[in-house]
């Protein structure tokens, strides 16, 4: 009976956490989403802890990345199981360690979680930085401001800390331990006060002595159906759609116009007439146009962001972080049979963190920016390197049309918001079917393309926004990278040594100390 109850609790946690990443803006659920499965750990063995957290992981990931079935059913199942294994390993590690003092649990468990999130992100080939726990708070601006110091990892730590503290409070109430209750409550309160005080301080505007350079940017959302992409019969329709939207945006006198990923319907170098139309439009509106296009060089093909002006191509960036099994086949030289299972063309890897330069009207000072293509904005290291290279603002061009009317575009937006906060830079998004918007350095979505009903995906349009480029010092996180993860790794290593002896004892987690 207890095991059956534990399974229901594990499923409940998976559902709560998945809803926190849904399109329904339920991020608050992440503050206590782990509580049911944590409570189910009472009197469980290592094997059962592994099993319970595996269930939570499967439910969470199935409910979070269900939209991948529009691309691959088998791949979705494999990925769900792989990602759920991180949950299972998490349960395995923390189960014996919960026998330690409650104060250690409050520090240890969040540290383990952050370390596993980081490993999931950087793991070779299978690195997947989607749905980090901290992303769920993208609408709660005071909570996420700490990301400019710790990265998103600090937000994830805070959420896990809150979950563990709530469990401590529940056990203290059940066992009538006033001291335990006070300790957990006070620590949670102090942690929240510290983070929220910093958050409110950062989001309140303050006078600055830095030189501001207003730059007007227009983002285009073509809303081209995925089945139209790369259909030669649709090329003129696609190009005409973007040309017409750009012409409409010209009334706002933008300094830069941004098209989505792969908006250019042909390989750039193979169809000069299409490139000429873009150059003519750039000349007409007197502003450069950043287009997403497939480019080729020396027999290789790249997924690129290309800056075009009346004179021609000014510069380009080739995507660095490609999508495995979507843009290339990992290990195909070692396992050649994969090419027959996944028959896709290879997109070559870029190797340069390119920075584009534009000159806003009425301003002889250059403004620099960098582009993140597709899911590159979910990897903090890429944005950080662009910021270090001198980018004054960031751009994300993407095509999420693959995933239909699902939560995928909203989850993708979550990552963009945290990238803006981490680097304290404006971020402009141009997405084929949405969500196209502008995000300011504190993570606020200041404007978005939407229809009259407020729908943001699968609508056609453009949006122009003036951003103020501020020449300020790089954020602490930008300068010192993932230092917070290193601290969590050290805490994990140190505290793992202590409970090894506890493996011989079946003591309950969070058990009251013996008097």
Predicted regions and their residues:
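Short polybasic linear motifs
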Residues: 208, 212, 502-507, 511-512
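Membrane-embedded alpha-helical bundles of multi-pass enzymes
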Residues: 2-205, 405, 419, 431-433, ...
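CN hydrolase (nitrilase-like) catalytic-core segments centered on the catalytic cysteine
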Residues: 83, 110, 256, 263-264, ...
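Soluble catalytic regions of membrane-associated enzymes that act on cell-envelope
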Residues: 199-328, 345, 355-365, 371-377, ...
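Short, conserved active-site loops that position catalytic residues or coordinate cofactors/metal ions
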Residues: 21-36, 221-222, 253-266, 397-400
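Cysteine/selenocysteine-centered motifs that mediate thiol-based redox chemistry or coordinate metal-sulfur cofactors
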Residues: 341-362, 366-368, 372-373, 468-503
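A short, polar/charged loop-to-alpha-helix boundary motif
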Residues: 319, 323-335, 452-470
């Amino acid at each position: 009976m207890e095991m059956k109850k534990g399974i229901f609790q594990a499923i409940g946690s998976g559902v709560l956490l998945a809803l926190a990443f849904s399109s329904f803006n339920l991020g608050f659920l992440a503050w206590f989403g782990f509580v049911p499965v944590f409570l189910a750990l009472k009197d469980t063995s290592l094997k059962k802890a592994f099993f319970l957290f595996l269930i939570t992981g499967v439910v969470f990931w199935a409910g979070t990345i269900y939209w991948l079935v529009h691309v691959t059913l088998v791949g979705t199942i494999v990925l769900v199981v792989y990602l759920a294994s991180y949950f299972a390993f998490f349960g395995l590690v923390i189960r014996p360690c919960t026998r330690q003092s409650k104060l250690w649990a409050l520090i240890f468990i969040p540290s383990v979680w952050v370390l596993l999130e980081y490993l999931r992100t950087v793991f070779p080939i299978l690195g997947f930085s989607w749905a980090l726990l901290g992303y769920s708070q993208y609408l709660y601006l005071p909570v996420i401001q700490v990301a400019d110091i710790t990265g998103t990892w600090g937000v994830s730590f805070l959420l896990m800390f809150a979950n563990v503290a709530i469990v401590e409070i529940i056990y203290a109430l059940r066992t009538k331990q006033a001291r335990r209750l006070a300790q957990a409550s006070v620590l949670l309160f102090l942690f929240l006060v510290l983070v929220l005080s910093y958050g409110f301080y950062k989001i309140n505007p303050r006078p600055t002595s830095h030189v501001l350079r207003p730059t007007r940017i227009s983002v285009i959302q073509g809303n081209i159906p995925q089945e139209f992409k790369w259909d030669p019969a649709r090329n003129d329709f696609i190009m005409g759609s973007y040309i017409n939207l750009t012409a409409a945006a010209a009334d706002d006198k933008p300094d830069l116009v941004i098209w989505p990923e792969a908006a250019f319907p042909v390989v750039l170098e193979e169809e000069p007439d299409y490139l000429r139309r873009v150059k003519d439009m750039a000349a007409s509106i007197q502003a450069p146009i950043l287009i997403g296009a497939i480019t080729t060089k020396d027999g290789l093909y790249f997924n690129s962001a290309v800056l075009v002006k009346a004179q021609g191509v000014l510069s380009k960036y080739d995507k660095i972080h490609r999508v495995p099994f979507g843009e290339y086949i990992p290990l195909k030289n070692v396992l050649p049979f994969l090419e027959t299972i996944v028959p896709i063309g290879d997109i070559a890897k870029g190797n340069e963190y390119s920075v584009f330069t534009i000159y806003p009207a009425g301003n002889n000072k250059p403004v620099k920016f960098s582009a993140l293509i597709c899911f590159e904005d979910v990897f903090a290291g890429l944005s950080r390197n662009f910021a270090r290279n001198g980018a004054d603002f960031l751009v994300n061009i993407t095509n999420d049309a693959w995933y239909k009317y699902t939560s995928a575009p909203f989850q993708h937006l979550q990552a963009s918001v945290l990238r803006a906060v981490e680097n304290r830079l404006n971020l402009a998004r141009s997405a084929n079917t949405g969500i196209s918007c502008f995000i300011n350095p504190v993570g606020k979505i200041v404007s978005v393309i939407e229809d009259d009903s407020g729908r943001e995906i699968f609508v056609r349009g453009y949006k122009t926004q003036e951003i103020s480029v501020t020449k300020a010092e790089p954020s602490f996180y930008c300068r010192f990278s993932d230092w917070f993860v290193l601290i969590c790794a050290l805490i994990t290593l140190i505290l793992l040594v202590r409970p090894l002896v506890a493996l011989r004892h079946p003591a309950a987690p969070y058990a009251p100390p013996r008097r």
